[in-house]
Amino acid sequence: WDGGREKAPAAMCRKAIMADEGGEIEVWGDGKQTRSFLFIDECVESVWRLMKSEFNEPVNIGSEEMISINDFAQMAIDISGKDVKIKNVDVPQIGVRGRNSDNTLYEKNIGWAPNQKLRVGMEKTYKWIETQVNNGEN
């Protein structure tokens, strides 16, 4: 969550927490890249269910809720309750333009799929990172 090398959920939360009221947070690229994020509790649940099953083929596990990086940054800002703007920073393209999970095979064979809304997971992540920042931990 610290140091600038974290993944997008932690980075967006950290940036929103550390942003000054009326300030801005940087988002690399145009922010139109899309991703889906899976909260750790559901990742663990998915792996546990897979391990208990008889299914033994490669399978995707992820959220099917896709969001643009700009909308994701705005979600972190909204959770913060601050008036903060997004500043898109022009950088060479990093990674793929869009990425999402298809849980059809997993759900068909395991009978379950992650279903926690992204906002709920982000609120939990935000709260944890905010505590770390406020305690000066890194």
Roles of regions detected by a PLM:
Residues 1-13, 34:
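Flexible, glycine-rich beta-alpha linker
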